């Protein structure tokens, strides 16, 4: 398998601002459905189709957390030789990069994004999703999250193929 093969997911992204934490990032795509990942609490802004589903203030729902972890683990367990990429819009990426809270564990992730993009000359709308998988997961949740992760990768390959 070509080591540079990629699973590409094209989305219409929007940002869900976090309160005292990293931001939610909400993506909507053909193969993933609507997913949110991030921590903290916030209210949704963006297309009305997503507002209707995510417009809320308060903690992330269990469903959002599960889908968030499926993205993390989907990247971690991506088939050998593949790299997962998410293409989205400038506003989402820029806001994610600016949402750095030193007292939050996610703050250093935002800083790594800045450095990675600077080092590789990546355009703002291009984000490599594998850098979302930095956290360890509670052991009792691995099985379900991993199942969702593998399913996500299978669907990405099925729906989009490789590029």
Predicted regions and their residues:
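Metal-dependent nuclease catalytic cores in nucleic-acid-processing enzymes
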Residues: 65-82
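Conserved phosphate-coordination/catalytic loops
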Residues: 60-66, 107, 143
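RNase H-like nuclease fold core
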Residues: 1-65, 77
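Short coil/turn segments at beta-strand junctions that form active-site/ligand-binding loops
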Residues: 5-6, 81-83, 122
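C-terminal functional segments of enzyme domains
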Residues: 18-20, 36, 40, 87, ...
